[in-house]
Amino acid sequence: MNPDDKAGLEMALERKDQYGAHVTVITMGPPQADDILREAFAMGADRAIHLSDRKFAGADTLATSNAIAGALRMLDFDLVITGRQAIDGDTAQVGPQIAEHLGLPQVTYLEGIKYEGGNRLVVKKWTEEGYQLLEVETPCVVTVLSSANQPRYMSVRGIVEAYDKQVEVWGFDNISVEESKLGLAGSPTRVFKSFTKGAKSAGKVFELEPAEAADLIVEKLKEKFII
């Protein structure tokens, strides 16, 4: 589970501790994504849904958000919490796109949230210029920064019980989304090339007396036309 998502889960679990909220965790991915949901169970989540279907394969952020929004339409909820972004694509698009698909208000880059009664929340949003305190009504979608909190550790008992709980696997037939909006067919983004950044060679290590070291540094700086 990536750091932003884990902070988002912790924020949801804090609502559970304080107000008795029911926490449902959703992920979309291949079979091994089941491990992430088991981790969420071990931390304290109540329900886990794994979106997995060949029709979801090849999805970009738009198709991914369409699938998750389709699953959310089948559920009752007051608040949707996502991490700010994944650690692979780093687009920070899925959370806001989910909100758009569902027609819900959204607040991104959260570092704090407070329940004000009724259907009102006060949230602390990070910006490059500082922080904003905003009021938002539920249902809504928020995206969370990893710096928002310190996620709880999984207990031994929680880990053991996590493997006794059922992860629900949902496919295309379980969500209310047109097939043309899912997977590769529903993805306007196309990857033409991917590559691995080349590793840098290791630097040289010199063991010299201080005076010799100083002379060598000056020599190298002159070679680079720095001095």
Per-range role (PLM):
Residues 1-227:
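N-terminal glycine-rich FAD/FM-binding segment characteristic of electron-transfer flavoproteins
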